[in-house]
C-alpha cells in the first residue's frame, strides 16, 4: 500500500456493521459515508467509543490531541494521514440526518508494525573508561502468517542473549495477529538488556565488537536493528573534553568537579539500575542533606571547643586554689 490512500465507503442506516482492514505504518485512510452532505445535520466521530470530534455544517470541534495534526474530519468523512501503530482500533461516525434518520459508519483499523527500540545508556564514565547498558524492547510484532512464537537475540557476534516470546493468551491479540506488551504481563518480558565496557585508548581491531544488534525472528520473518555503542561513549568523552577546554577553573578544581560529577552520575545510575523508570534525585532534598550535615559538623566543633575551654578554666582555677 505504501503511502497511497485507501478509501472505504460504508453505508449504514440504523445498523452497525464492522469490518477489519490492515494497513501499514504511514498509510493514509479515509472512512466515509455516501450520504448526501446536504441531508446531514451533524456527525459525531468516535475512536474506540471515545468522541474524536463533532462535525456540523459550520465547523468541526473537539479534536483529541493525538489526532490534531493528522486528521481531517467533515460531516461525511474521517481522513487520517501517516498512520501510527497506536492508531489501531475501531472508528465510528454517527450522522444525524435532518429527517431524523441516523446513519452509522463503523470500521476496524489494524496497523501492522514492528516496533523495536534499541537504546544505549551510559552507566559509568571517566576520561578513560565507559560502561553502557544496552536495552532492546519489543513493543509490537506482526506475525505475518507465522504459526510459531517469535524469538529475540541481543548482542554482538561473541556476546549475546536469547529470549523466546511468552505465549500466554493475554500476550496475543487474535484480531490483530500480533504479540503485544501490556498488563497484566510485565513489559520487561519482551525486553533484553546487556552491559558492555569500553576503554578510550583501546585500538579497535574488530568493529563487530562495537556493533550491537537486536534480532527479532519467527518462522518466516526476521527484523533487526543495529547500534554502535562505542559511538555513544565517544560522544560522552568528547563532551568531557569540551567542558575541560571551555572551563576557566584551575586544574585541581576541574578534577574535583569532574570527580564529583562522576560520583553523582554513578549514584544516579545505581539508582536507575534498581528502577529504570524512577524519577531523578530531588535536588532540593540533596541540598538539604548537605546543609544539615555541615551544620552538624559545625555544632560538633563548637561543642568540642567549649568543652576544651571549660576544661582549661577548671584546670587553671584548680591551680590558683
From Swiss-Prot:
Keyword Transmembrane helix: yes
Primary localization: host cell
Tagged with keyword Signal: yes
Subcellular location: Host cell membrane
Gene3D superfamilies: Immunoglobulins
Membrane-spanning parts: 286-306
Domain of life the protein comes from: Viruses
GO biological process: viral process
Signal peptide: 1-20
Induction: Expressed in the early phase of the viral replicative cycle.
Topology of the protein relative to the lipid bilayer: Single-pass membrane protein
GO CC, alphabetical: host cell plasma membrane; membrane
Glycosylation sites: 36, 41, 72, 79, 108, 144, 220, 245
Keywords for this protein: Glycoprotein, Host cell membrane, Host membrane, Membrane, Signal, Transmembrane, Transmembrane helix
One Pfam match: Pox_I6
Disulfide bond annotation, renumbered to this chain: none
Function: Plays a role in the spread of virus to neighboring cells ex vivo.
Family per record: Belongs to the orthopoxvirus OPG049 family.
Protein name in UniProt: Protein OPG049
Species per Swiss-Prot/TrEMBL record: Vaccinia virus (strain L-IVP) (VACV)
Amino acid at each position: 500500500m505504501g503511502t497511497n490512500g485507501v478509501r472505504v465507503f460504508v453505508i449504514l442506516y440504523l445498523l452497525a456493521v464492522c469490518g477489519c482492514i490492515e494497513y501499514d505504518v504511514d498509510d493514509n485512510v479515509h472512512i466515509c459515508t455516501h450520504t448526501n452532505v446536504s441531508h446531514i445535520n451533524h456527525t459525531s466521530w468516535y475512536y474506540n467509543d471515545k468522541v474524536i470530534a463533532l462535525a456540523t455544517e459550520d465547523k468541526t470541534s473537539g479534536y483529541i490531541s493525538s489526532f490534531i495534526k493528522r486528521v481531517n474530519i467533515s460531516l461525511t468523512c474521517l481522513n487520517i494521514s501517516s498512520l501510527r501503530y497506536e492508531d489501531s482500533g475501531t472508528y465510528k461516525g454517527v450522522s444525524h440526518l435532518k429527517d431524523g434518520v441516523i446513519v452509522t459508519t463503523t470500521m476496524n483499523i489494524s496497523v501492522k508494525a514492528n516496533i523495536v527500540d534499541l537504546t544505549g545508556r551510559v552507566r559509568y564514565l571517566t576520561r578513560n573508561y565507559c560502561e553502557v547498558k544496552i536495552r532492546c524492547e519489543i513493543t509490537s510484532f506482526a506475525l505475518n502468517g507465522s504459526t510459531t512464537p517469535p524469538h529475540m537475540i541481543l548482542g554482538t557476534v561473541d556476546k549475546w542473549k536469547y529470549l523466546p516470546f511468552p505465549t500466554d493468551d493475554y500476550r496475543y491479540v487474535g484480531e490483530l495477529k500480533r504479540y503485544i506488551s501490556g498488563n497484566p504481563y510485565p513489559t520487561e518480558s519482551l525486553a533484553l538488556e546487556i552491559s558492555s565496557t569500553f576503554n578510550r585508548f583501546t585500538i579497535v581491531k574488530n568493529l563487530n565488537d562495537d556493533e550491537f544488534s537486536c534480532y527479532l525472528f519467527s518462522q518466516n520473518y526476521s527484523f533487526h536493528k543495529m547500534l554502535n555503542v562505542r559511538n555513544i561513549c565517544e560522544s560522552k568523552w568528547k563532551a568531557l573534553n569540551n567542558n575541560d577546554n571551555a572551563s576557566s577553573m584551575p586544574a585541581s578544581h576541574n578534577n574535583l568537579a569532574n570527580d564529583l560529577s562522576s560520583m553523582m552520575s554513578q549514584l544516579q545510575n545505581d539508582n536507575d539500575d534498581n528502577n529504570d523508570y524512577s524519577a531523578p534525585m530531588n535536588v532540593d532534598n540533596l541540598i538539604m542533606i548537605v546543609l544539615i550535615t555541615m551544620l552538624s559538623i559545625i555544632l560538633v566543633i563548637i561543642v568540642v571547643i567549649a568543652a576544651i575551654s571549660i576544661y582549661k578554666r577548671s584546670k587553671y582555677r584548680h591551680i590558683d586554689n
